[in-house]
């Protein structure tokens, strides 16, 4: 158009991406996991999550397919770690509910580097930051069982995470999953826990 005047092009928005407000479900494929008493269990698990920050979700994960893959990785990793700390009888019994609550809670944290932790608002003292210590083999504590550091250990971590006093531990930094990906894992459930086929 070559005539004079001001012209507007509509629509102003090229495309709209919609995200579901409802709970989304991810069914993980059955996995053979080793328990603390060195027995294999085939565990079939599912998790439900929701999008709590659509903009951050879109920036980090783009779509539900990517989100399902990420949720699957996170839940599978935490389930594998938790099952390795529990006996087969505990996983099959009523204690299963407590185990699933621990997996859900751990799955709602995203690991970040020390540098990323320092760059959070408030740095290593940020209310959004969780610092966990994992004992290595050869210590008095159960290897792989994460725990919160004591006040003295927190002071050491802030000064120098490689100090001799922390040699028997690996230090990890976590932020809430909602701050990392804009999602929150609401529930993790075992559909089935069977002995492997012989």
Predicted regions and their residues:
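Amphipathic, coiled-coil-like alpha-helical scaffolding segments used for oligomerization/assembly
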Residues: 35-38, 42-43, 48-49, 67-196
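Short intrinsically disordered, low-complexity coil segments enriched in acidic
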Residues: 1-9, 47, 179, 198
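Short extracytoplasmic
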Residues: 1-26
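N-terminal post-signal-peptidase region of extra-cytosolic proteins
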Residues: 19-36, 57-61, 170-172
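Short, charged/polar surface micro-motifs in flexible loops or helix N-caps
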Residues: 48-56
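Flexible, surface-exposed loop regions and adjacent strand-edge segments
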Residues: 63-65
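Short acidic, Gly/Pro-enriched loop/turn segments at secondary-structure junctions
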Residues: 56-57, 195-198
């Amino acid at each position: 158009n070559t005539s004079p005047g001001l012209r507007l092009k509509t629509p102003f928005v090229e495309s709209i991406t919609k995200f579901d407000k409802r709970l989304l479900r991810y069914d993980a494929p059955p996995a053979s996991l080793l328990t603390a008493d060195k027995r294999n269990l085939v565990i079939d698990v599912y998790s439900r999550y929701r999008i709590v920050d659509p903009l951050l979700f879109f920036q980090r994960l783009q779509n539900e397919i990517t989100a399902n893959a990420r949720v699957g990785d996170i839940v599978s990793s935490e389930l594998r770690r938790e099952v390795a700390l529990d006996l087969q009888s505990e996983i099959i019994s009523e204690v299963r509910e407590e185990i699933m609550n621990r997996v859900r809670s751990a799955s709602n944290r995203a690991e970040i580097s020390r540098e990323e932790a320092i760059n959070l608002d408030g740095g290593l003292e940020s209310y959004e930051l969780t610092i966990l210590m994992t004992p290595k083999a050869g210590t008095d504590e159960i290897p792989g069982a994460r725990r919160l550091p004591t006040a003295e250990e927190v002071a050491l971590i802030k000064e120098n995470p490689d100090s001799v006093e922390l040699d028997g531990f690996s230090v990890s930094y976590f932020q809430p999953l909602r701050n990392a990906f804009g999602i929150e894992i609401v529930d993790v459930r075992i559909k089935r826990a069977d002995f492997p086929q012989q």
